[in-house]
């Protein structure tokens, strides 16, 4: 079976899946042909199990449909194709069952002769050895002090401060925000997988997903999770060397080491940690010397069994100016998206923050704020702080009327921002689907009807032309938008549910 057939079927699957699902589970797969067999490699056991359970049946169905009736022999393995650099398989997957099924030095193979119709699960074959990155003894660290903390752009107010100096060359103050823990991280559908993966790494350092790569927009909780991992590691082992810093701090330290002719001390320092947590890795883009040094540091840490966690504002392969070899290595572990929180999670975040501040926040007031502040958690918390301050200074209870007063300028700005993006986000939340579903080519009614509603709202509430609306809905033709608008207008007359949905969405977007 040709690799081209596989790629063709993957492209068909891309059209069926939300972008986040495709990027997380299908995109990391590598494939190579071996005679009549197609070998598909997953970067770790968790991805292998998930693909086997959720997507293998559909993939086999597509391969059967487009393979001219030939029954493909497919093996799903942990590892990478032989043309790629060898790497270690994870030792402790997220699921307990997977942990029992996979040994530290094994590959799990799933073989499935597929008929032309959908095949369900595949049988697990005898594990075969996989090439692992050599594990070396940890370097001597007697000359280094433990370091934990954040050297990020905004130093948290409440933190444990530690100053670290490396033989006169490197000296900087770091902060670990003790208020960022797993216990006060509000979990929702948008961050559920990221939270679970971070907990697995924190509870089983060096034996979970390495590296763990979290990506998503600003203010969505990536940094919170990194601090939570660091706090948990130090709770389990107070002597652990956990380094949390912004990528720009790494660059600054390297520059300082070069100026002081202390690059060897720099290397020894960063390669002697138990866990390296680096925020906003996209700032390494187009910094060739920094990327070179980080590449070798990254390799040394993984070979030594030390944990690495990275974050970025975008999928690693989409970071322009970042070397391909770094992008490839970032995919060795688990890459997870953190999406904007849905309405229920935003309400839960507000209620939790109010409880921490010992402030009585009525549920309807929290719902009012959450409906209007949808961009990210940081803006949501900022709005709540303004409301609490206004309530305190005015000596009044928090009500919707007080919220309107304290957030007057912000709400006025939101009223002006009835954009197509805003409409897509609101409609997706209302129907409990993903924004990527609205942009996909899926035609099931559960997706197609909300998509038509969103198009009709975009025509009514924005000044965009039909071609412009079609373009931001996955590159659709203007006739598709016109049909959607006509269809929704008809349904508003004949379908009470659609009429009520449209009215509710219109009210949410304009009040």
Curated annotation (Swiss-Prot):
Gene3D superfamilies hit by this protein: 1.10.1750.10, 1.10.8.60, 3.30.300.180, P-loop containing nucleotide triphosphate hydrolases
NCBIfam families on file: DnaA
Gene name tied to this protein: dnaA
GO MF, one annotated term: ATP binding
Source organism (scientific name): Pseudomonas syringae pv. syringae (strain B728a)
Coiled coil: none
Protein name in UniProt: Chromosomal replication initiator protein DnaA
Gene Ontology biological process terms in this record: DNA replication initiation; regulation of DNA replication
Domain III, AAA+ region: region residues: 175-391
Domain characteristics, as noted in the entry: Domain I is involved in oligomerization and binding regulators, domain II is flexibile and of varying length in different bacteria, domain III forms the AAA+ region, while domain IV binds dsDNA.
Described purpose of this protein according to its UniProt entry: Plays an essential role in the initiation and regulation of chromosomal replication. ATP-DnaA binds to the origin of replication (oriC) to initiate formation of the DNA replication initiation complex once per cell cycle. Binds the DnaA box (a 9 base pair repeat at the origin) and separates the double-stranded (ds)DNA. Forms a right-handed helical filament on oriC DNA; dsDNA binds to the exterior of the filament while single-stranded (ss)DNA is stabiized in the filament's interior.
Keyword Glycoprotein: no
Metal-binding found in the keyword field: no
HAMAP family given in the database record: DnaA_bact
Residues annotated to bind ATP: 219, 221-223
């Amino acid at each position: 079976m040709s690799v081209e057939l596989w790629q063709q079927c993957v492209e068909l699957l891309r059209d069926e899946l939300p972008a986040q699902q495709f990027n997380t589970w299908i995109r990391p797969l590598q494939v190579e042909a071996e005679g009549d067999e197609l070998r598909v490699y997953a970067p770790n056991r968790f991805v292998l199990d998930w693909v086997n359970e959720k997507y293998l049946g559909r993939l086999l169905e597509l391969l059967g449909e487009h393979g001219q009736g030939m029954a493909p022999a497919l093996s799903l393995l942990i590892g990478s194709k032989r043309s790629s650099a060898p790497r270690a398989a994870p030792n402790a997957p997220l699921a307990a069952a997977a942990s029992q099924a996979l040994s530290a030095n094994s590959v799990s193979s799933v073989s499935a002769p597929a008929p032309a119709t959908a095949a369900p699960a595949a049988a697990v074959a005898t594990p075969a050895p996989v090439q692992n990155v050599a594990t070396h003894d940890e370097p001597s660290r007697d000359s280094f002090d433990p370091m934990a903390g954040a050297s990020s752009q905004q130093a948290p107010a409440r933190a444990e401060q530690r100053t670290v100096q490396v033989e006169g060359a490197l000296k900087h103050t770091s902060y670990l925000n003790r208020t960022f823990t797993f216990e006060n991280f509000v979990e929702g559908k948008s961050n559920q997988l990221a939270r679970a993966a971070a907990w697995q790494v924190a509870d089983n350092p060096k034996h979970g997903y390495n590296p763990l790569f979290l990506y998503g927009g600003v203010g969505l909780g990536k940094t919170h999770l990194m601090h939570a991992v660091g706090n948990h590691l130090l709770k389990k082992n107070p002597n652990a060397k956990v380094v949390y810093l912004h990528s720009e701090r790494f660059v600054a330290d390297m520059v300082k080491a070069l100026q002081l002719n202390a690059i060897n001390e720099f290397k020894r320092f960063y390669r002697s940690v138990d866990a390296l947590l680096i925020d906003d890795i996209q700032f390494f883009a187009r910094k060739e010397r920094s990327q070179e040094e980080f590449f070798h540091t990254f390799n040394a840490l993984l070979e030594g069994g030390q944990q690495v966690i990275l974050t970025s504002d975008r999928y690693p392969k989409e970071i322009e100016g970042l070397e391909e070899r770094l992008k490839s290595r970032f995919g060795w572990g688990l890459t997870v998206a953190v999406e904007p929180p849905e309405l229920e999670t935003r309400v839960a975040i507000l209620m939790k923050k109010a409880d921490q501040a010992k402030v009585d926040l009525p549920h309807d007031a929290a719902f009012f704020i959450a409906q209007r502040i949808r961009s990210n958690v940081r803006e949501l918390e900022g709005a709540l702080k303004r409301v609490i301050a206004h309530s305190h200074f005015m000596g009044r209870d928090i009500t919707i009327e007080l919220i309107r007063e304290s957030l007057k300028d912000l709400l006025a700005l939101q009223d002006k921002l009835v954009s197509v993006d805003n409409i897509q986000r609101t409609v997706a939340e209302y129907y409990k689907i993903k924004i990527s579903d609205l942009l996909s080519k899926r035609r099931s009614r559960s997706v197609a009807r909300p998509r038509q509603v969103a198009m009709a709202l975009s025509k009514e509430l924005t000044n965009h032309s039909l071609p412009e609306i079609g373009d931001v809905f996955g590159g659709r033709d203007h006739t598709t938008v016109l049909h959607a608008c006509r269809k929704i207008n008809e349904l508003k007359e004949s379908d009470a549910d659609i009429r009520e949905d449209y009215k509710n969405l219109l009210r949410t977007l304009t009040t």
